[in-house]
């Protein structure tokens, strides 16, 4: 098997990743200009990215009586001041605006008898959001002069003299290679999951907090192209309902459930209430023999029972099914909780591309928004949209400049360079596709498991209670480099397996050159 031909396309704007930030950026660009857009999406924009399964709340919203600066202070405190305040403020100022726009597109936001949004805490409002990604995708698909290419896996930027010219990839279904040239490129590929050994084994290994298909492609491409990155040591570990990995905030904020240990003691105040402190407290209680730990739901009302079961249907139906299968409502049994494996995700930590307030990266013409952009934690859905909008507005502004095509090199030189890189990548794709089983030592899946085992053992995974030291990190780096060398001899029986090869390579790149 080999790559099935080459498509060369040209556009004003290339958006890599058709998730929350990417789709919203496309809407903004077309609203404010006539620029042509290509969206390259590895899956299908109808159900891709973090919104694929829906959400039951907007977790970043400036509720009545609050102001954007309050949200900045919340995010700073939660991240122990490891933030860029300028990025947080520019995001926070747009949260309500993008929410209103989503409501106009058809998102159902719950309201009280006075017509006000129903708040859930100081920064959240309740929604019926199972179809939120469908709403966003339908809006994008209705735009003129926007081409959405689903099932297109982008593997490399085309960068010359620190200026981006486009990107290269292949179609997972047809096997066609793509060289897409663009004046401006927005990276919106999300964060990275699958770096560490997950909570659940075997068939259920992808039952995780973050989309398992977000493997950090944007991080890896940026690192390989020389873009400045930031704060990859800042990992996100989610506190979730055990086994289902369903969100705990729905219970904690929805019915005011406290974190308790096996003795029935409320332990959350002992350690603190920030995101990291809630996870830390749960880990310490288990280490010290007072586990398992729970969210205390026993004794809530029957109305609250029904409210919780309905809420989880909007984003994590497995939790509702677990209650039904057990024959017990939340009011009859506490909900056991645990920490997930660590993730690299700029929507909850400060890890990702180093960007300015317009979301420009350090590579000319390349922007980053959403979970791939660093410095600005606690984005959630609306924060990703806000960053997509910020980047889009600056892209439009830059496209309108008369000197946009003036570079330090000629167009002929740029074309020659792009074509050469594309040819090299196609050759690389074909090497993986043509290599037979007898010529490779380990399968991609075996190498992935080895990578996750190394990270779990030496780089602070679940198995080591998230703890590590300098010696362990050095060992992790050595072993990851060995696995990276072995990955060069991987093979792929088809184009889908070729995608798996590159997903492995992406994670090894961000671990070996940025994380450990």
Regions found by a protein language model. Name each.
Residues 129-156, 160-163, 168-179, 219, ...:
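Helical element adjacent to the flavin cofactor pocket in flavoenzyme catalytic cores
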Residues 187-246, 382-386, 390-394:
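Glycine-rich loop(s) and the adjacent beta-strand/alpha-helix scaffold that form part
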Residues 96, 103-155, 231-380, 385, ...:
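Mobile, glycine/GP-rich and aromatic-enriched active-site lid/loop segments adjacent to catalytic centers
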Residues 229, 233-241, 372-379, 393-452, ...:
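Active-site-proximal substrate-binding core of FAD-dependent oxidoreductases
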Residues 59-91:
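Glycine-rich active-site loop/strand segments that organize a redox cofactor
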Residues 31-53:
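Glycine-rich FAD pyrophosphate-binding loop
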Residues 13-39:
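N-terminal Rossmann-like FAD-binding beta1-loop-alpha1 element of flavoenzymes
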């Amino acid at each position: 098997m080999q790559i099935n031909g080459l498509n060369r396309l040209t556009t004003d704007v290339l958006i890599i990743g058709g998730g929350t930030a990417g789709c919203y950026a496309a809407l903004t660009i077309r609203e404010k200009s006539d620029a042509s857009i290509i969206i390259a999406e590895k899956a299908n924009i109808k159900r891709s990215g973090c919104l694929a399964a829906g959400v039951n709340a907007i977790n970043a919203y400036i509720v009545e009586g609050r102001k954007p600066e309050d949200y900045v202070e919340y995010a700073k405190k939660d991240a122990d001041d490891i933030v860029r305040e300028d990025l947080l403020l520019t995001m926070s100022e747009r949260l309500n605006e993008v929410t209103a726009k989503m409501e106009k597109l058809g998102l159902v936001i719950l309201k009280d008898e006075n017509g006000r949004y129903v708040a859930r805490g100081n920064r959240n409002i309740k929604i019926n959001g199972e179809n939120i990604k469908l709403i966003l995708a339908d809006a994008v698909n209705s735009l003129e002069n926007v081409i959405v290419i689903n099932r297109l896996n982008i593997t490399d930027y085309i960068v010359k003299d620190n200026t981006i010219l486009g990107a290269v990839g292949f179609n997972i279904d047809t096997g066609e290679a793509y060289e897409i040239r663009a004046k401006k490129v927005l990276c919106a590929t999300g964060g990275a999951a699958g770096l560490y050994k997950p909570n659940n084994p075997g068939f259920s290994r992808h039952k995780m907090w973050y989309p398992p298909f977000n493997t950090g492609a944007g991080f890896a491409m940026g690192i390989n192209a020389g873009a400045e990155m930031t704060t990859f040591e800042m990992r996100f570990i989610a506190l979730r309902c055990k086994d289902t990995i369903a969100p705990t905030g729905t219970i904690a904020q929805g019915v005011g459930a406290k974190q308790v240990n096996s003795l029935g003691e409320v332990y959350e105040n002992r350690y603190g209430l920030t995101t990291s402190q809630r996870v830390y407290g749960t880990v310490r209680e288990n280490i010290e023999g007072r586990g398992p730990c729970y969210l205390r739901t026993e004794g809530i009302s029957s109305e609250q029972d029904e409210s919780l079961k309905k809420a989880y249907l909007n984003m994590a139906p497995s939790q509702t099914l677990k209650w039904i299968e057990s024959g017990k409502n939340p009011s009859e049994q506490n909900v056991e909780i645990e920490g997930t494996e660590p993730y690299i995700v700029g929507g909850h930590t400060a890890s990702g591309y180093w960007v300015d307030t317009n979301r420009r990266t350090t590579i000319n013409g390349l922007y980053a928004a959403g979970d791939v952009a660093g410095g600005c934690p606690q984005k959630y859905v609306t924060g990703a949209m806000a960053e997509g909008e910020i980047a889009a507005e600056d892209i439009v502004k830059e496209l309108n400049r008369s000197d946009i095509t003036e570079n330090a090199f000629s167009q002929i030189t740029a074309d020659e360079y792009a074509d050469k890189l594309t040819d090299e990548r196609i050759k690389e794709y074909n090497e993986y596709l043509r290599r037979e089983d007898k010529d490779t030592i380990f399968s991609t899946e075996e190498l992935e498991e080895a990578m996750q085992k190394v990270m779990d053992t030496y780089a602070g995974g679940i198995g080591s209670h998230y703890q590590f030291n300098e010696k362990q990190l050095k060992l992790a780096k050595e072993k990851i480099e060995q696995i990276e060398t072995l990955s060069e001899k991987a093979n792929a029986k088809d184009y889908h397996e070729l995608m798996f090869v590159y997903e492995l390579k992406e994670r090894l790149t961000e671990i070996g050159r940025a994380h450990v």
